[in-house]
Amino acid sequence: VHWTAEEKQLITQVWGKIDVAQIGGETLACLLVVYPWTQRFFPDFGNLSNAAAICGNAKVKAHGKKVLTSFGDAVKNLDNIKDTFAKLSELHCDKLHVDPVNFRLLGNVMITRLAAHFGKDFTPACHAAFQKLTGAVAHALARRYH
């Protein structure tokens, strides 16, 4: 992936303002609510019976923070995302058997949460940069499947 200086600046600028625990929890909760089939990957998370239960679930919030922390690793390693996610790709492919389409869904949900939090500050240029980032992360996570 080739990044322009503007894209790198937009991504790092916004990322520096993110509350990883809050946005991460919201992102994973939204994924589980909007795409309920993704719940099957989290059998140990307890009550995922409705949106309120999912959004209030401590395990969802904790794992969401973990997921967004991984996106932070991508932000720190924009020029080496594939290697940054090599082990996670292996885990999600070989052990967890996650369909790679879910990585793109997660990225799209994260972008909606960022847009909701940052409002007008989440400009079209910023949105485009994050779309490129989430696409690169999804591609890196799916790498082991190819």
UniProtKB/Swiss-Prot annotation:
Top-level lineage group: Eukaryota
Example of a GO biological process term: hydrogen peroxide catabolic process
Gene3D superfamilies documented for this protein: Globins
Presence of the UniProt keyword Heme in the record: yes
Tissue: Red blood cells.
Cross-referenced Pfam families: Globin (PF00042)
Keyword Ion transport listed: no
UniProt keyword list: Heme, Iron, Metal-binding, Oxygen transport, Transport
Any single GO CC term annotated in Swiss-Prot or TrEMBL for this entry: haptoglobin-hemoglobin complex
One of the record's GO molecular function terms: oxygen carrier activity
SUPFAM superfamilies in the record: Globin-like
Binding site for heme b: H63, H92
InterPro entries hit by this protein: Globin (IPR000971), Globin-like_sf (IPR009050), Globin/Proto (IPR012292), Hemoglobin_b (IPR002337), Hemoglobin_oxygen_transport (IPR050056)
Domain Globin: 2-146
Subunit field text: Heterotetramer of two alpha chains and two beta chains.
Functional note: Involved in oxygen transport from the lung to the various peripheral tissues.
UniProt family annotation: Belongs to the globin family.
Name this protein carries in UniProt: Hemoglobin subunit beta-1
